[in-house]
Amino acid sequence: MTTLQESITMLTLTHIADTHLGHRQYGLKQREDDMVSTTRAAFQEMIEERGTDAILLPGDLFHSRDLRPKILHQIEQELERIPDDVPVLVSRGNHDENLTPRDVTWLNYLHQRGQIVFLESELKANEDTAWFNPYDPDEPGQSAGFYDIDAEGVEKPIRVFGLQWRGAKSGLALQQVAEGIKETNEMHGEPAWTVLLAHFGIEDEVPTLGGTVTHGELRDVKDVVDYLALGHIHKRYESGGWIYNPGSPEAHNTREGRADWDHGYYSIALNDGSAEGNSSSIGFDVDHHPTKRRPYYQIAFDVTEYESPSNLETAFREHVQDEQAAITDHCSQSEFMAGGDPRAPIIDLRFTGTLQFSRGDFRTDELAAW
């Protein structure tokens, strides 16, 4: 993060990813609603508290590639709450792709309606160079390649490019993108500052989660990009002062709900660079903000010492009662509050040890319901 105490903020961007709207986790409608309400709260915070001039969303706006009408309607309602002068710049993630080949995706649909700007790279025309079409508000088409944002006090634009999910082909696509950005800037003029939206994991950044892209494959991209806005990995990570991955707004499994997983969004304040003594450069200050999400809490119970179902049930109830104060304390953290009250947690119930009676008498559903 670059800290610039005396610089003047010219533009504020916010960066969120992996909203997964429509995800009915565990088959629960409440979790589907959580995805929407957490994203809504983040958008509202970006606008009212961060004063964002544009929202960056690199992939997985949706959870399901084939949307139910209700989910599409909810997404449109949330996008309509965002002021018209705050563009929502979106690239495609793996969950946003169609299950079957079609010419038009739901991102194309929202782009054509003016609710988002869908950015993607044309990678098929030239195997060495990506092609990027400028966004035209009068003729938006089905997508655009880049979007220019005017910043106060700067003659050149802030330019945002998009690269769609490419999976194992991401490394090759990034080489095409690096060349394509150079050619685009020669054709349309050099920008003051450059953002690339992309959806992939980086090797070794988050151990055990894997990644399809190496730092070596990003070397050419770094020469032409100032801020790589990533999505795909649901855990926050940053690298090299130019790579940022905010973590999904909501945790999508018990592992993601652990305390060592940060979830949220970034605000990026662009400034004139005067605090560094270089008035001709663009400086930037990046802050991470936790999203207001539903907490997870793990309860572990060792069954080994109980010789009958009734003894186990009594001990289990006492154990859960003993955990109540800790649960309340955990859920009272600021990121788990809704309207001033703690949100009810998702309980991750783990039974451990060796059962001393018939497994058929071990009624886990009844214990979980209690």
Q: Where do the protein language model's features map onto the residues?
A:
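His/Asp/Glu-rich metal-coordinating catalytic cores
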Residues: 54, 65-269, 275
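Short, internal active-site loops enriched in acidic
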Residues: 34, 61-62, 95, 351-357
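Domain-start "cap" segments at the beginnings of catalytic or binding domains
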Residues: 8-29, 269-305
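N-terminal active-site segment of His-dependent metallophosphoesterases
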Residues: 2-78, 84-85
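A generic secondary-structure signal
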Residues: 41, 45, 49, 77-81, ...
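A short, flexible beta-alpha/helix-coil linker loop
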Residues: 20-23, 60-64, 201-203, 250-251, ...
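Accessory, non-catalytic peripheral segments of nucleic-acid enzymes
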Residues: 278-370
